[in-house]
Amino acid sequence: MTEESNQANNHGNDTYSPIRTKVRMQRANGFRILEMYEEAEEELSKICPEDRLERDVLTMNLAVRQDAEDWSSMLKTARILRRQYPDASEWWIAEAYALRRSESMESAREVLLDAEKRHVDDPCIKYNLSCYSCRKGDIKTALRYLLAAVELDAKYKKLALEDEDLVEMREVLLKLGFSTESEPDES
């Protein structure tokens, strides 16, 4: 079957099927990995309109835009995901990440403060609030958030010493026993 007859059989719409959506997503991800962001965006744009608001399609869209450092487009996608899935903390964090880069750190901080009310036990939200507080010069608040994050997930103890956003409190962290060495398992 030729390309022309295939399009005719599909009434000119050869891209809109669930299988095609999966293939388009795989292609988009391949282009993203190769840092061919325009091609990735093109593949995503060929996904049928009904599928474009599906979580996995939006997630791929977000990843492409983040990797391409297209912060304003990433922000739009992150907001859609956060509104559709408010119980998933990663979309709040993605929105804050894009806001920080496209608008301001204060706007990003406000989103995370709202997120913290809904996701009280999310260490990544607390960690990011620590970073934003430190960048603002509020070391006391930064330390409070960081210690809360570490209490929930010890991996943030090591990350804190490597994070440029927390450089202003590095000495305090070292005095508190933070280390870049992996801690032994408590078995």
Language model regions located:
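N-terminal acidic, proline/glycine-rich, low-complexity intrinsically disordered segments
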Residues: 1-11
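Structural signature of tandem alpha-helical TPR/SEL1-like repeats
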Residues: 5-6, 34-42, 68-80, 102-114, ...
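Canonical positions in the second alpha-helix
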Residues: 13, 46-47, 80-81, 114-115, ...
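Alpha-helical segment of the N-proximal tetratricopeptide repeat
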Residues: 17-67, 94
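Alpha-helical adaptor scaffolds
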Residues: 56-124
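TPR/TPR-like alpha-solenoid helical repeat scaffolds
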Residues: 62-67, 97-100, 131-134, 155-178
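TPR/TPR-like (Sel1-like) alpha-helical repeat modules
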Residues: 134-158, 181-184
